[in-house]
C-alpha cells in the first residue's frame, strides 16, 4: 500500500484538506500516451489506488507501463466505535490523496489503444469519483 514511510517527529493530525476548486497542476498526460483524469473532487485512499493499479496491470498483462501520479500523503482520523464525545481527535485511520477536478491520476503507455482503454475503464470503476480517459495532445513531448 502507498503511504508515507514514517510520519515526521511531532506529527500533528491534519485538518481535512480543501477539495474546492480545480487542480492547479498535474492536469496533462506527461509520461504515457493515455491517462485517467478526475472530473469530481474526492479523497482517494491507498487501497483504491492499489485496486485500480491491479485492475489495469492484470488486463494489459505484458508490454505496457503504468504510472501512478498521485500519492496518499494526507492522514484521515477516526475515533473508535461507542466512544463518548470529546477527549481529543481520533487516531489516523486512512491515508488519502486529495484529488481535485482535472487531475490526472494514472498514466499508461501500451501499443494497442483498445486494450489500453479497456484497462483504464476497469480501473475507473475502482475509483470513488467520475473520471474520463484522456490522451496525450499532439505536440507535447
Swiss-Prot record:
It holds the Pfam family Ribosomal_L16. Residues 1-27 are annotated as: Disordered. One of its GO terms (cellular component) is cytosolic large ribosomal subunit. The keyword tRNA-binding applies. Keywords: Ribonucleoprotein, Ribosomal protein, RNA-binding, rRNA-binding, tRNA-binding. Residues 1-16 have a biased composition (Basic residues). Transmembrane segments: none annotated. PROSITE patterns: RIBOSOMAL_L16_2. InterPro entries: Ribosomal_uL16, Ribosomal_uL16_bact-type, Ribosomal_uL16_CS, Ribosomal_uL16_dom, Ribosomal_uL16_sf. One of its GO terms (biological process) is translation. GO terms for molecular function: rRNA binding; structural constituent of ribosome; tRNA binding. Part of the 50S ribosomal subunit. Binds 23S rRNA and is also seen to make contacts with the A and possibly P site tRNAs. Belongs to the universal ribosomal protein uL16 family. This is Large ribosomal subunit protein uL16. It comes from Salinispora tropica (strain ATCC BAA-916 / DSM 44818 / JCM 13857 / NBRC 105044 / CNB-440). The gene is rplP.
